[in-house]
């Protein structure tokens, strides 16, 4: 007998131990468009909205994938429902019903543009990763292939920025108030960067539109936090065993979740505070602390742990020297670069993060965290190094994860393995040319201006990076262990 598929009709058949929506999903209406319907959105923002829909059913989500139809094809037959597995010492399964519509922009572009122009849509949220903003430094990269296409074909965009501009243009023409565009990606000052990118793209074809956006639309900054490992076959099997129905794409995350949003909305908003969201006038301090004290150590664990042939974050935290190094890095090197915040205790925050990293129920693969290093390290580590240099603070420990990333590139290139990174081809070419000698290799890597332009001319940084690279060479576990113990 075939196993039934998760759907609204199947909700009544689920075990009572499974949490299900406290509202009727069919009775909700769409008020939010989300660009980038990946696992993090479905584990984070959609869960907060799910908590609010019983009270206000007008904020359901249209989830848009910009390129791949996989999420749409998996969840549309399930009425948008999916399972969230909350992982800790008391694991729990929950069905999320906040997504009422799923679209793929690659083959449903008119529907996406129509939804962005819908007067009922008052909020557009984004999780498109750092590379999805098509930035060069802090500004929109007009030479980026997708942006160049969107300038030439503004009514048929490819990029997330292009879709926002096209949607806002249609609203302006129709006399409809703009939506709030809310970035939920790990970018420092993400709302400001998004606003600059949208206005700059609009300026290329329609200066009146750019002015209207600048005057009337808002782009709040936000900070998001919850560790969300990739879905694997073990999760799919566990969910099916527990539910008795088939879920094509369940997701998992730790129980801890945080969302801080700058309270700056131009067209109404959900009652976020009732779902546990922190609304603040200024979130820069929260965002910086998270990027530097959580995301930067995550990257350190990913690259150093990979060189030690470890598989998961929990495995890496079980390595005594690596765990001690990361804790010292957070306490002695990163914390001094943060500005004091009322009510914020750095040591308590560090202790909580380390406990989350050690959670054995979370199989967060180091290989997944290692993706897109060229985009991540600039905001997670290199800015911290720049601030430390400006303050006359030591940077040697901060440079070790950067050097580990370079050895990771070298190893991937030497093994003929693909590098998952927007600059993968350029970095792999450099990796193939390396010898393991710091004096030869570091100058070659420093030519990648998109990563190192702000630091490559600083002799203190170059010297510290060369020292760390040499200490790790040739990238074997024994040399990594020795470098961690220095």
Label the predicted regions.
Residues 1-486:
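Substrate/ligand-engaging "lid" and interaction regions
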């Amino acid at each position: 007998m075939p196993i039934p598929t998760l759907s609204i009709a199947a909700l009544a058949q689920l075990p009572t131990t499974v949490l299900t929506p406290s509202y009727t999903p069919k009775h909700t209406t769409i008020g939010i468009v989300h660009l980038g319907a990946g696992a993090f959105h479905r584990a984070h923002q959609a869960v907060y909205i799910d908590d609010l829909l019983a009270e206000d059913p007008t904020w359901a989500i249209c989830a848009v994938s910009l390129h791949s139809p996989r999420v749409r094809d998996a969840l549309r037959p399930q009425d948008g429902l999916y399972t969230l597995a909350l992982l800790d010492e008391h694991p729990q399964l929950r069905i999320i019903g906040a997504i009422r519509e799923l679209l793929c922009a690659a083959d449903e572009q008119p529907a996406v543009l129509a939804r962005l122009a819908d007067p009922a849509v008052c909020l557009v949220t984004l999780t498109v990763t750092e590379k999805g903003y098509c930035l060069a430094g802090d500004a929109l990269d007009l030479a980026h292939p997708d942006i160049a296409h969107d300038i030439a074909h503004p009514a048929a965009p490819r990029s997330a920025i292009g879709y926002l501009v096209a949607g806002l243009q249609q609203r302006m023409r129709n006399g409809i108030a703009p939506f709030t565009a809310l970035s939920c990606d790990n970018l420092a000052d993400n709302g400001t960067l998004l606003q600059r990118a949208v206005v700059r793209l609009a300026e290329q074809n329609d200066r009146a539109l750019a002015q209207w956006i600048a005057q009337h639309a808002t782009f709040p900054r936000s900070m998001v936090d919850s560790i969300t490992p990739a879905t694997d076959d073990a999760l799919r099997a566990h969910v099916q065993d527990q539910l008795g129905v088939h879920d094509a794409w369940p997701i998992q995350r730790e129980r801890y979740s945080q969302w801080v949003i700058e309270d700056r909305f131009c067209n109404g908003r959900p009652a976020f505070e009732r779902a546990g969201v922190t609304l603040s006038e200024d979130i820069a301090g929260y965002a910086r602390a998270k990027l530097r004290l959580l995301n930067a150590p995550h990257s350190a664990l990913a690259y150093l742990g990979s060189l030690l042939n470890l598989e998961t974050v929990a495995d890496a935290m079980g390595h005594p020297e690596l765990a001690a190094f990361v804790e010292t890095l957070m306490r002695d090197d990163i914390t001094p670069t943060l500005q004091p915040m009322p009510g914020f205790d750095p040591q308590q925050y560090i202790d909580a993060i380390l406990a989350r990293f050690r959670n054995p129920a979370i199989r967060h693969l180091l290989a997944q965290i290692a993706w897109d290093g060229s985009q991540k390290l600039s905001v997670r580590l290199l800015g911290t190094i720049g601030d430390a240099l400006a303050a006359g603070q030591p940077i040697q420990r901060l440079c070790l994860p950067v050097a580990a990333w370079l050895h990771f590139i070298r190893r991937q290139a030497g093994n003929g393995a693909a590098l998952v990174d927007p600059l993968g081809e350029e970095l792999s070419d450099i990796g193939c040319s390396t010898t393991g000698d710091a004096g030869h290799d570091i100058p070659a890597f420093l030519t990648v201006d998109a990563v190192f332009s702000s630091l490559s001319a600083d002799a203190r940084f170059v010297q510290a990076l060369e020292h760390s690279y040499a200490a790790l060479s040739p990238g074997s576990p024994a040399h990594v262990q020795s470098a961690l113990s220095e």
